[in-house]
């Protein structure tokens, strides 16, 4: 759960109208709101003959391929089976999320030659080669990405540009266990690996994203002595956007106006979520993310969800169900 918590991350303390705990915001608060909305609808309209389905899949953070992607492949999001989808991600109770940026994940390995650490000139340090890669990123790739801007309404503001995170770096020998009290081996590392997390814009083709990184690596191969690398793609997700005129967008918009007395804000998410599978595998375009919570709190110490926000979102979801599913008077 990370360091810095002042509340037990697994106890769901309620303090000043906020429920604290790991996952309360992202996205158990939204899931709870959707369950309350569905239960209230069924209780209020016991003769309703249609179907309301809540899918509580568990692997969205690791790609969603065993959850929503599997359901989509089995036809559960076929427009003949399901007509409207709300994913209760924490984009805030007065926002409607139309889609998300794209993502490209890859591993880069720089290669060297092992040798005794007292004679590094007899080997070739893969970590130093990786340092050259990182320097290219700092001087060329990061400034280029920061200069790009999208017309997608991505929040927060910093995500309106392309971004890349270096998720991990590993080089040389395996780290020793905490209880190891010896000295590290004296070896020149012959391998160094980083995992990159590149988030790209609707205006950027995926091939351009790949080629930009590979081009920097090829440039180093040409200019740096003995530089060698291997680039392995881990996963890719294309950007997704639902049209603002879609029925689910218009219906939730009106519910926000009616329940909260304010105009909704239309946004896009900096990271991908299960809409990518519903859109491209399920072929259902009538899908949004809507739910309580502040996206900036996701995965943070003292993550919380406000009870009042959950109630308001449940009311919006309930009103949406009535509009979409009941006969018009």
Regions found by a protein language model. Give the residues of each.
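Short glycine/proline-enriched loop/turn "hinge" motifs that connect secondary-structure elements
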Residues: 2-4, 46, 97-103, 185-189, ...
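Short glycine/serine- and small hydrophobic-enriched flexible loop segments
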Residues: 36-43, 132-138, 319-322
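Acidic-enriched catalytic cores of C-N bond-cleaving enzymes acting on peptides and small amides
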Residues: 98, 117-180, 185-188, 202-228
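An extended, acidic, His-containing surface patch that forms the Zn2+-binding/catalytic region
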Residues: 142-176, 228-329
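Acidic/histidine-rich catalytic neighborhood of metal-dependent amide-processing enzymes
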Residues: 27-101, 329
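Acidic/His- and Gly-rich active-site-bordering loop/insert found
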Residues: 1-22, 43-48, 294
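Acidic-glycine-rich active-site phosphate/pyrophosphate-binding loop
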Residues: 2-15, 99-109, 288
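Hydrophobic beta-strand positions in extracellular immunoglobulin-like domains
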Residues: 110, 198-200
């Amino acid at each position: 759960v990370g360091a810095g918590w002042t509340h037990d991350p697994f106890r769901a303390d309620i303090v000043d109208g906020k429920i604290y705990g790991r996952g309360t915001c992202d996205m158990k608060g939204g899931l709870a709101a959707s369950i309350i909305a569905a239960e209230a609808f069924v209780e209020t309209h016991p003769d309703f003959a249609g179907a309301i389905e809540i899918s509580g899949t568990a692997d969205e953070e690791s790609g969603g391929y065993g959850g929503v992607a599997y359901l989509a492949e089995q036809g559960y999001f076929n427009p003949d089976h399901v007509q409207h989808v709300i994913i209760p991600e924490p984009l805030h109770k007065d926002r409607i999320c139309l889609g998300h940026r794209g993502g490209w994940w890859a591993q880069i390995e720089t290669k060297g030659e092992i040798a005794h650490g007292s004679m590094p000139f007899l080997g070739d340090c893969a970590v130093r080669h990786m340092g050259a890669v990182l320097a290219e990123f700092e001087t060329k790739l990061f400034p280029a990405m920061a200069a790009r801007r999208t017309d997608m309404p991505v929040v927060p503001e910093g995500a309106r540009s392309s971004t890349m995170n270096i998720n991990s770096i590993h080089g040389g020998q395996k780290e020793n266990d905490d209880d190891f009290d010896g000295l590290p081996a004296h070896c020149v590392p012959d391998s160094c690996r980083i995992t990159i997390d590149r988030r790209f814009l609707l205006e950027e083709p995926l091939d351009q994203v790949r080629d930009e990184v590979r081009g920097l690596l090829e440039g180093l191969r040409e200019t740096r002595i003995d530089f060698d690398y291997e680039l392995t793609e881990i996963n890719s997700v294309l950007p997704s956007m639902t049209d603002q005129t879609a029925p689910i967008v218009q219906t939730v918009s009106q519910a926000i106006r009616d329940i909260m007395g304010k105009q909704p804000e239309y946004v896009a998410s900096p990271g991908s979520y299960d809409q990518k599978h519903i859109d491209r595998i399920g072929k259902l375009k009538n899908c949004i993310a809507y739910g309580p919570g502040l996206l900036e709190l996701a995965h943070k110490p003292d993550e919380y969800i406000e009870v009042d926000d959950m109630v308001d979102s449940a009311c919006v979801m309930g009103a949406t169900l009535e509009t979409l599913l009941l006969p018009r008077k």
